[in-house]
Amino acid sequence: MMARRDPTSWAKRLVRAQTLQKQRRAPVGPRAPPPDEEDPRLKCKNCGAFGHTARSTRCPMKCWKAALVPATLGKKEGKENLKPWKPRVEANPGPLNKDKGEKEERPRQQDPQRKALLHMFSGKPPEKPLPNGKGSTEPSDYLRVASGPMPVHTTSKRPRVDPVLADGSATEMSGRGSVLASLSPLRKASLSSSSSLGPKERQTGAAADIPQPAVRHQGREPLLVVKPTHSSPEGGCREVPQAASKTHGLLQAARPQAQDKRPAVTSQPCPPAATHSLGLGSNLSFGPGAKRPAQAPIQACLNFPKKPRLGPFQIPESAIQGGELGALENLQPPPAATELGPSTSPQMGRRTSAQVPSVERQPPHSRPCLPTAQACTMSHHSAASHDGAQPLRVLFRRLENGRWSSSLLAAPSFHSPEKPGAFLAQSPHVSEKSEAPCVRVPPSVLYEDLQVSSSSEDSDSDLE
């Protein structure tokens, strides 16, 4: 019975079994087209063409023989912009053009406001907009533009001085500069100081001519050297009623008595030009503390010197005691009459009572006295008609009770040089030691007793 089977039936069964296995292995989904068929949904990754895949034999990247030059499918006129774009007419602007026009008009309206603000802050006239962008050359255009007031330019130059006045004041400035340049700070401060005297006192002063050379002295404090210009004396001496200084009065009374024993010290007519050379317009006097000193009718100077500043060794006007003589109250031509110590002996007033009334001392105030005792020895040469003059010395000593004693020393004559002590016994004006009340000064200022006396040898050598 086995031999009787048909072999064809066995072959059909085998084919069916193989097809079933293929169907089980095949993925679920649409069946891929055969490679020869073209599917426009596919795109080749190698060449980027549509209709085949990268595994297809139609891809030119795998089969260069089958590669063909791509041919254009047809000419399309709508894609290329062969004709240029024509601008639209301004009469019918589009919506975009309307927005642009509004934005341009806004800054144009803000321009006048900006120009007005700039005109307010800068002061410049605003620029007038020209019509049609053309400049007008009409002569009346400037009247239409608002403009501010013109600025006034002032010059800081000083007015010129008349050459005649400049030449006349040059001599005064030269004399004044030679004197003020040689003054020490204490001496400059003493020019502005004043002390009070009784209202009933009347003093007259005589000024002596001042020659150019000066005398040095030996001392621990800086010396006062004055080199004023020499001026020719004019006329007689001026008398100052109740305005002359106390220093002038005492020295004038002392000089006539000293002429017998000291012929060198002589009175000379006061030169008015010397007052100008020293830069003072009037004689200063010792007036009451609350009143201003009276002024004598002497020629006033054109330019007064500036008030000197107070240094460590200088004092204001209120620092001088009322009943004592201050340091350098009146800067007059005779240097011997320029400075005296803080006090003058009462004996000098008694001896000169025949010519000058006695000095009435007022009770001392609670003001501090001079912080330092300055060297007051001044020497001068007389006129050419005299042989020579001697310096006037004032000796200051500090006592134990805090007071000061002053003594007036007269230098010996030029021909018979002697020691100051020996001449002290001969001179009738030698004042005894007198005590003047004074407020205590700190020891840092008065570090030692200042004793001012120059030897006759030094003064004689300087005079020669």
UniProtKB/Swiss-Prot annotation:
Residues 341-356 have a biased composition (Polar residues). Pfam families: zf-CCHC_6. Residues 74-89, 97-114 have a biased composition (Basic and acidic residues). Residues 180-197 have a biased composition (Low complexity). Residues 1-42, 70-389, 415-437 are annotated as: Disordered. Belongs to the FAM90 family. Primate-specific FAM90A gene family, thought to have arisen during multiple duplication and rearrangement events. This is Protein FAM90A11. It comes from Homo sapiens (Human). The gene is FAM90A11.
